Amino acid sequence: MAGSQSQASTLVARGGRSSSNAPTGAAGALRRRPVRGSGGSGTTKAQQAAMNFYTDDTPGWKMSPVVVITMSLSFIAFVTILHVVGKFQ
């Protein structure tokens, strides 16, 4: 028993390797990501299509999200006021 390690004293790393094969320091804590193709931002065709949909020059009113939310809340408040006024008449 002096030359061999017991089961309790052997540390097993996250990947299932014993502590004698496990990398030490920061290399042991971080795993490398697989290498992707040649450069680029990594956007897919679906993401590019979505960006084109939102950035294309389309006919219609151009409104920011803040304007849309403000108008929606105003409409909800107006309908609520109409219900309250209609209840008391």
Curated annotation (Swiss-Prot):
Q: Which family does it belong to?
A: Belongs to the SEC61-beta family.
User: What topology in the membrane does the UniProt record assign?
Assistant: Single-pass membrane protein
Q: Which domain of life is it from?
A: Eukaryota
Function (record text): Necessary for protein translocation in the endoplasmic reticulum.
What is its quaternary makeup? Answer: Heterotrimeric complex composed of SEC61-alpha, SEC61-beta and SEC61-gamma. Interacts with ARSA2.
Principal localisation: endoplasmic reticulum
Keyword tags: Endoplasmic reticulum, Membrane, Protein transport, Translocation, Transmembrane, Transmembrane helix, Transport
Where in or outside the cell it occurs: the entry states: Endoplasmic reticulum membrane
Residue ranges spanning the membrane: these are 66-86
Region (Disordered) location = 1-46
- CC per GO annotation: Sec61 translocon complex
Could you give a single Gene Ontology term from the biological process aspect?
tail-anchored membrane protein insertion into ER membrane
In Swiss-Prot or TrEMBL terms, this protein is called Protein transport protein Sec61 subunit beta
Q: Does the keyword Transmembrane apply?
A: yes
| Organism, as annotated | Chlamydomonas reinhardtii
Q: Which residue intervals are annotated with compositional bias (Polar residues) in the record?
A: 1-10
Membrane-side (Cytoplasmic) residue stretches = 1-65
